[in-house]
Amino acid sequence: MLDAIRKNGVTLAVFAAITTGLTAVINAVTKPTIEHQTAVQQKILLDQVVPPELYNNRIQDECYSVTDPALGNTNPHHLYLARKDDKPVAVALETTAPDGYSGNIQMIVGASFDGIVYGTRVVEHHETPGLGDKIELRISDWINSFNGKKVNGPSDGHFAVKKDGGDFDQFTGATITPRAVVNAVKRTTLYIETLPGQLSSLPTCGDANE
């Protein structure tokens, strides 16, 4: 009986070793493909918020970490710097709307250093399906209403939902969600205007405590 137990133990050990080895091989083979697909999707997202004709650097490789309450919390957010002939012209900046109806709304905002919004995308949210989820491009083109708009300072009343006297539509039965997004875009764009003097001192992604 002991011999049988030992034999089964050896068999299980060999099986475990083979399985572990196969898993390692599969991971090694698929990792480059996964990384490539992730990079492609990231570039597509960045080009949606900063038009590619505005820059000629590899924007996804110029990633910096920024932390500021204007971005919705004090967590590090990634900033992608767009350059034209080595001159900084715009950024795509991750940001958070902390006051969504169902919690945080994670976004990315592309803007120039003089307050012009190039594009905005929501990358994660938990808003109510059929109501607040109209902030998603696949459901509604509302998010494109920011394109080309300029934020004229902190007191710019146009940068608000219509219910608050601004220019942006709210959703039927859902004002909290679009209000949170509009306010986050405004705060983030105003913050981007302050960045030119800080760019040289920003930590690169991975160097900060993220």
Swiss-Prot record:
Indicate whether Translocase appears among the record's keywords: yes
Supply one GO CC term from the record: plasma membrane
Q: Which EC numbers characterise this protein's activity in its record?
A: 7.-.-.-
Please provide the record's keywords in A-Z order: Cell inner membrane, Cell membrane, Electron transport, Flavoprotein, FMN, Membrane, Phosphoprotein, Translocase, Transmembrane, Transmembrane helix, Transport
What is an example of a GO molecular function annotated in this UniProt entry?
FMN binding
Q: What is its main location?
A: membrane
The subcellular location is:
Cell inner membrane
EC category: translocase
Membrane topology, record value: Single-pass membrane protein
Q: What residue intervals traverse the membrane?
A: 9-29
Q: Which GO terms describe its biological process?
A: electron transport chain
RNA-binding found in the keyword field: no
Which residues are annotated with the PTM FMN phosphoryl threonine?
A: 175
Q: What cofactor does this chain's UniProt record say it requires?
A: FMN
Describe the function of this protein. Answer: Part of a membrane-bound complex that couples electron transfer with translocation of ions across the membrane.
* Protein family (similarity comment): Belongs to the RnfG family.
Oligomer status and interactors = The complex is composed of six subunits: RnfA, RnfB, RnfC, RnfD, RnfE and RnfG.
PANTHER family recorded? ION-TRANSLOCATING OXIDOREDUCTASE COMPLEX SUBUNIT G (PTHR36118:SF1)
The protein here is known as: Ion-translocating oxidoreductase complex subunit G
